[in-house]
Amino acid sequence: MKRMGFNHIDLATTDMGATRAFYEGVLGFPCVRTDVLEIEAAGTVEHVFFDCGDGQMIAFASAEGSPGRWPANLDTSLSKGLGLGRGVYHFAFGHEFARS
């Protein structure tokens, strides 16, 4: 099987508006897909995909439209829920910056 990198990473967010503002406005990743899913255990889930380049995406799921389905204090960090220090589990985007 030919390795082709990842298709997408999927994370949770409790504020889709702020997530979109950061990934679209700050990082410049265009939104390429938005789904609204009806999931019995989670209710209505908004699922948004951003293009990171090279055919790879990062996606976020939010159940803001289903109050009470996800805890209001949902911890969306990668490390804390595993009992690890900050930054232990993470992902990084490659980039090119012009050097002066």
Regions found by a protein language model. Give the residues of each.
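Core-facing hydrophobic residues within beta-strands of well-ordered domains
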Residues: 3-6, 88
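Vicinal oxygen chelate
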Residues: 14-17, 38, 73-100
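Long, contiguous binding/interaction regions
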Residues: 68-71
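Short secondary-structure boundary/capping segments
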Residues: 1, 49-50, 80-83
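Core segments of cupin and vicinal oxygen chelate
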Residues: 12-65
